[in-house]
Amino acid sequence: MNLRFLNSRKLINIIEMAAQLILQIYHRDNFMVEIKEDKSPLTEADKKANEYICNQLTSIYPDIPIISEENKNEDYEKRSKYEFAWLIDPLDGTKEFISRNGEFTVNIGLIHLGVPVAGFVNIPCTGITYWAIKGCGAWKKKYNEEDSIMIEPRGEDGIRRKKKIVLASRSHMNEETVEYISKLGGDVELKNVGSSIKLMWIADNKADIYPRLAPTMEWDTCASDAILRELGGGCHIYFKEIVIGGGGGGSGGVEYLIYNKECLLNPSFIASVD
């Protein structure tokens, strides 16, 4: 597999411009909110960012299909033939966007035969883009700054905290998640944050583990998963009968999330970096 066709600067520019479109609407006094068939909210920002990202990707990479939260996606008979595909969540954390707490992201992931091989995640309210292309390391870049800074894999010399920082969703803290956290052992500090920011905190070594034992869609995780995998971790499937003590992303029978399945719903997973 050759990923040299990917232009990281162009992709960073796309996600940064989408973030700016979102912020223009975010800073208005008010904006329209619709309710989709699945009861989730949809704003003008979701629509504008999605349209911009899809148009830009189609212009630069016309042969790569797009799977997006805000598009009518092809049925599986056609999708199953995709070699490469973009998975896009133009505004992850729409509820956070509406509540104006700043905890929302833009997500562009690329898969190859179901495996995430590139990911770009922007946090509009901080201006930071995290990104990775398989085999090229993981990076972060501040808006209006020219260069990206490499995120060092943790390895043997990585920062080790006395407390294990565990992340949880603001709106999906269920009994199974509470039970899982209680079995981790040691000194645990629980933090709540919205959207794929949780996964980027793990990538940036600001947290250790994120158990997601509630529904998510493939476009919610693909970009972040690609970044975590480049750091030696990832989103691995959670099996209740196995008590995982905060590891993951390594060997030993760990099964990672796969993408472009017939059903685009993710199983429960644990995100971490060894």
Predicted regions and their residues:
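Residue-level signal for inorganic ion chemistry
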Residues: A18, I22, D46, L57, ...
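Glycine-rich active-site/cofactor-binding loop and its immediate structural neighborhood
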Residues: Y82-C125
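Oxyanion/phosphate-interacting regions
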Residues: M1-N13, A19, E179-L184, L199-D274
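Acidic beta-strand-loop-alpha-helix segment within the catalytic core
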Residues: I108-M200, G246-D274
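N-terminal subdomain of lithium-sensitive/metallo-dependent phosphomonoesterases centered on the IMPase/IPPase/PAP
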Residues: M1-L91, E179-K183, V243-G252
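Conserved beta-strand termini and adjacent loop/short-helix elements that scaffold enzyme active sites
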Residues: K36, E69, S169, V193, ...
